[in-house]
Amino acid sequence: MPILEAPEERLRKFKYRGKDASVRRQQRLAVSLELRKAKKDEQALKRRNITTASDPFVQQTNGAKLTLQEIIHGVNASDPEQCFQATQAARKMLSQERNPPLKLMVEAGLIPRLVQLLRSSLHPCLQFEAAWALTNIASGASELTRAVVEGGAIQPLVELLASSHMSVCEQAVWALGNIAGDGAEFRDIVISSNAIPHLLALASSNVPVTFLRNIVWTLSNLCRNKNPCPCDNAVKQMLPVLSHLLQHRDSEVLSDTCWALSYLTDGCDERIGQVVDMGVLPRLVELMTSSELNVLTPSLRTVGNIVTGTDPQTQLAIDAGLLSVLPHLLLHPRSSIQKEAAWALSNVAAGPHQHIQQLIACGALPPLVALLKNGEFKVQKEAVWTVANFTTGGTVDQLVQLVQAGVLEPLINLLDIQDTKMVIIILDVIFFILQAAEKISQKENMCLLIEGLGGIDKIEALQLHENRQVALTALSIIERYFSEEEDAGTLSALLQDHECLTPLTKT
């Protein structure tokens, strides 16, 4: 509680105190994890290829549909034409929009034969159909993807990346993307099978944009997942090409490129540094101004990840123009963008007072206060964290500017919420503001302002809160700043039989 320890000790313990970089870093990661858990990922892990007649290798066959038993018999036939007809029939069943029989095909034992057919170099149309069938099986649940991997599909699929037939090559890319998207285990098997050099060569060649989209999506899945992260050598191979792809004009290519970079920056400072060293920050900030949500979202996520890194890395993002864009994104019509922007801003506010001053100078305070007043609750929470970081790392003059921006009214209004942790944070912010006012002999004026906003009544009511930490925080504020001197011993007496409370952190 504010009154229980020296201000310097409390500031050190509070979230993101600038002098303790290791603690700040751990807590920034905790905030990042919470944000990630709170929202669904916009990028698809896996994609199933639905039947289309536009591909040159898709031959329209006539006659009755084959039964599963006929498919099993035909796929294993030695006659290439019969084998093709059966494999295509299997692929069509696996490509139907509703309830494709993925598990049924696996249980029928088709995977080993489909893997064999991937090496039918004399029959590229057969390779294509087999790769397509495996692509769709791998798009299913993890157990089905595992069946494809354990059936030995990865190595022949990687070999098909060098096929002279573009459709075969593209289908192999798609299949590998689905396998890598299942998780770190299969991602690393794809990487160890030397897929990346082939994918990068394809990405750098003059392929149609539809093909390039699949390549970039597969590369993004090779950047995806942690515990463990993709190996350093793989990242070093991919980064130059990803950096180049950021200049592409196609929104889907840009989207998946940004997603790839967002996965790479969602980790250690060293990996963030590798991305930053590619010089991509100015372009990422530029893409944050895109009107296309599928580009804006991952570019904002990537830059948001970068500012969870070191203070110099955050400064590079600021130098790239981050703070000229964030205030506008705080007012974006989509609450998901507001939340991401507020989260990014909270990490800027978690830095030294120089970063906080740049935040003020860019005009971020008015839209931040607007979010505190009118944003959805999930957005208000991120805005509260931004203010909390601001008050712990800012100078007295900066806290004065925060108050002048009107932050107290919405904070006091939020004291009624049911989120106990948020209430504690808001009470701590109010304490820091009062402490700053005391330092410049403005305690009485600040108390009058809080009283005029209805703050005293709300803080007094919180003394009876069922959560002990809320109650004691409220009591300490009332006793220190709003009570008569003869009541000053109440808090210390109350605490005699109780342990001091743990410092506030976000988990």
From Swiss-Prot:
It is found in: Nucleus. InterPro entries: ARM-like, ARM-type_fold, Arm_3, Armadillo, Importin-a_IBB, Importin-a_IBB_sf, Importin_alpha. Residues 1-57 form the IBB domain. Gene3D superfamilies: Importin-alpha, importin-beta-binding domain, Leucine-rich Repeat Variant. Pfam families: Arm, Arm_3, IBB. ARM repeats lie at residues 99-139, 142-181, 184-224, 227-266, 269-308, 311-350, 353-392, 396-435. GO terms for cellular component: cytoplasm; nucleus. Keywords: Nucleus, Protein transport, Repeat, Transport. One of its GO terms (molecular function) is nuclear localization sequence binding. GO terms for biological process: NLS-bearing protein import into nucleus. Belongs to the importin alpha family. Binds to importin subunit beta-1/KPNB1 via the IBB domain; this complex dissociates in the presence of RAN-GTP. Shows a limited binding to the RB1 nuclear localization signal (NLS), but not to the SV40, nor NPM1 NLSs. Interacts with RSL1D1. Functions in nuclear protein import. This is Importin subunit alpha-8.
